[in-house]
């Protein structure tokens, strides 16, 4: 367990609690497909980085109630380990193509987190464009269109948001808090479950 990983039991309790109180968890794609009045009882559930543990742990928990989520993946890391993450204390695998296809077929949205999980604030304009455009093209061709993006490390500014807006309708940051679609759609906040 680390500061961005939710323990399995905590996640299970959260999902059970939401269900018992008439709330549902869903992907951003599913949420946007609903009439606005129906959205009040739904929460968009997101996972960054696309670790394989989602397949073995989160999928069964959410599937129990027919819930789904959006998982943000880096396209060059699909099926590989997390050597890129020197802050992670253990070696973890990213979801592979078969696992991502299963999630997609179960109603999960597969969305972009860039190509390599680079800090966008440190990239040149050409590198930034590549990360945003290439990941969009790959995700859309493999799993169908996605309008969502999550900034690696939450790293963004007005210029990065403008670049992302050329390809996506919504972008998630790592800022804590609730949000609405009438807010800044390229700086959507989220709550961590802990």
Each language-model region and where it sits:
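A short, Lys/Arg-enriched amphipathic alpha-helix followed by its capping loop at the start of a domain
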Residues: 13-21, 61-66, 106
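Glycine-rich anion/phosphate-binding loops
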Residues: 52-54
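Noncatalytic alpha-helical scaffolds and linker/capping helices
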Residues: 48-50
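Metal-dependent polysaccharide deacetylase catalytic core of the NodB/CE4 family, i.e.
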Residues: 1-2, 40-43, 63-157, 181-189
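A short acidic, amphipathic alpha-helical/loop segment
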Residues: 57-61, 159-163
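N-terminal pre-catalytic segment of deacetylase/amide-hydrolase enzymes
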Residues: 1-43
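Conserved beta-strand segments of alpha/beta enzyme cores
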Residues: 24, 109, 169-170
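Acidic, His- and aromatic-enriched active-site or binding-groove loops in soluble protein domains
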Residues: 92-93, 168-177
